[in-house]
Every structure is written in C-alpha cells, then in structure tokens.
C-alpha cells in the first residue's frame, strides 16, 4: 500500500506543496493512476503540458514515467497555457490531457488538472485515483508506452486565427508596459 497525503486530492484538481505533499515520487504514482484510468476507458495516449513553475520539468518527467509504465503513450507539449493542453488532446485525437500547473497558488505549490477520454476528472473520479494509488492498483504494461515532444503552438494560433472572421480591417494598439 502506498502512503500519500490524501488532502492533495481536491474536488477539481490535485495540488500540494512542492517537496512536501507533492514530490516527483507522488507525481509518478499519479501518472500510473491516470494511465490506468485512461486504459480502462479505452485510451492509449495522453498529452501533458506544464506552466513555468520550477518544479514543472521534474514533475512532467515523473508524470510521463508513471503513464508510460501502464503502456500509455505520452505527448509532451512543454510549457503552455492550460487551454493548449485541451486543444492538443482534441487536435491530436488523444482525448486525454494533463496540465501541471500551480495556477493562482503561491510559488511553493504545484498541481495537476486532468481530462481523461474527454471527461474532466473531478470529485469522485479524483478520489478514485487516490484509492488506486493507495491500493497500488495499476496496469503494468509488458513494454512501456512511447514518449514524444511536440510543439503545438503554431497549430493552436492558426486555429484561433482561422476562427476569427472580421467584417472590416482592425487597428490595434498595444502597450506591453512591464512585460
């Protein structure tokens, strides 16, 4: 049985303090639970993205390791905005996406938002992941799933630009101010 801080499993995401309740080891277990859940629902591929928090690269690697151990293929789209993970999951036909983000929380926090096979995981679905981790109830693949990186930025921008139809020429002024 795995010991894990149950309080990090919130109603609509998983989040905790980096290095305390949320470590790379914990994130790898979460990856195993998510990979197992995707497989149960008929999925074979999960897109992962992350924000710019310092723990993001290590957490992305750990998450991917856990998912791959179940046989799920991982597409890592790197540092992106959360909507880009959801876009990539649909655009690539994966139907599953996981965003590693601390959102509005202080810098020492990080977290995970999840969509598996088109369903945003929340409430009991998140508690089900916790139960799977506690019971060590994971799919174990004969061979690990694949891993690839992909830059989805141009496809995302082209989709947005393609969706906008102007009836007249637009003039825009922008002041970037402090960044």
Show which residues each predicted segment covers:
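Short, surface-exposed, polar/charged, turn-prone segments marking secondary-structure boundaries
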Residues: 36-37, 73-76, 103, 124-130, ...
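Generic, ordered loop/turn and secondary-structure boundary motif
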Residues: 9-10, 15-19, 23, 80, ...
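Gly/Ser/Thr-enriched, mixed-charge loops and adjacent short helices
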Residues: 110-179
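Alpha-helix boundary/capping residues
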Residues: 34, 92, 133-136
């Amino acid at each position: 049985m795995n010991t894990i801080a149950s309080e990090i499993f919130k109603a609509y995401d998983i989040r905790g303090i980096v290095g305390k309740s949320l470590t790379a080891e914990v994130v790898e277990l979460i990856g195993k639970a998510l990979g197992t859940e995707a497989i149960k629902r008929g999925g074979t591929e999960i897109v992962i993205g992350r924000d710019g928090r310092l723990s993001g690269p290590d957490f992305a690697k750990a998450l991917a390791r856990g998912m791959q151990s179940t046989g799920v293929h991982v597409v890592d789209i790197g540092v992106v905005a959360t909507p880009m993970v959801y876009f990539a999951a649909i655009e690539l036909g994966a139907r599953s996406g996981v965003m590693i983000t601390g959102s509005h929380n202080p810098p020492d926090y990080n977290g995970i938002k999840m969509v598996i096979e088109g369903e945003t995981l929340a409430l009991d679905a998140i508690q089900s992941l916790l139960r799977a981790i506690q019971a060590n109830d994971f799919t174990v693949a004969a061979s690990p799933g694949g891993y690839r990186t992909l830059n989805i930025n141009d496809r995302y921008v082209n989709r947005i630009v393609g969706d906008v139809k102007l009836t007249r020429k637009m003039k825009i002024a922008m002041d970037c101010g402090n960044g």
